[in-house]
Regions:
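A generic structural motif
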Residues: 9, 127-135
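Residues forming anionic-ligand binding surfaces in small-molecule and nucleic-acid pockets
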Residues: 2-11
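Short, hydrophobic beta-strand segments
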Residues: 5, 121-128
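Short, well-ordered turn and helix-capping elements at secondary-structure junctions
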Residues: 9, 103-108
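Short beta-strand/turn micro-motifs at beta-sheet edges
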Residues: 110-115
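Acidic-enriched catalytic cores of C-N bond-cleaving enzymes acting on peptides and small amides
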Residues: 1, 14-104, 116, 132-148
């Protein structure tokens, strides 16, 4: 899905309007940041309503699947994994729903600097759904968070 935040009717010079006019990029960044809490749990209202938790037995079976965390980190050249607290990386990538920002843009992006307050900001967001989640229902969920 694509999110668009609109502000003034045109790009504005920040030296003249900065501090008095809302910046759509700042608003969009706050909206995106609010989609996850400190435990990387998705905060979109209703997002987890139909997600079935695995039983302890199912999680134990999943833990038997071949997955080497150190090799995973080395292959990606990362120092640590991140994700929803309480789940392994194998679980996070295989059985848990996700919400990710795939792109964000707005304002001046050319060479050099231009002190502009943009009139619009955009983001592309994807969600991985799991069984029982409905794409129709979930598609309206981010709007609930955004409109809060």
């Amino acid at each position: 899905m694509e999110v668009e935040v609109t502000g003034p009717n045109r790009d504005l010079h920040s030296g003249v309007y900065g501090g008095a006019v809302a910046n759509p990029i700042n608003i969009l960044c706050k909206m995106i940041a609010s989609c996850h809490d400190e435990n990387n749990h998705i905060t979109v209202p209703g997002f987890y309503d139909k997600v079935q938790e695995l039983s302890a037995e199912e999680r134990a079976e999943m833990a038997k699947a071949p997955f080497n965390l150190e090799e995973y980190k080395k292959d990606l050249d990362i120092n640590e994994e991140r994700g929803e607290k309480g789940y392994s990386s194998n679980e996070r990538t295989g059985i848990r729903p996700t919400l990710d920002v795939n792109g964000i843009w707005g304002g001046y992006t050319g060479e050099g600097a231009k002190t502009v307050l943009p009139s619009k900001a955009f983001a592309k967001i994807s969600m991985r759904l799991v069984p029982n989640q409905s794409s129709k229902e979930i598609q309206s969920s981010p709007n609930k968070l955004i409109n809060q």
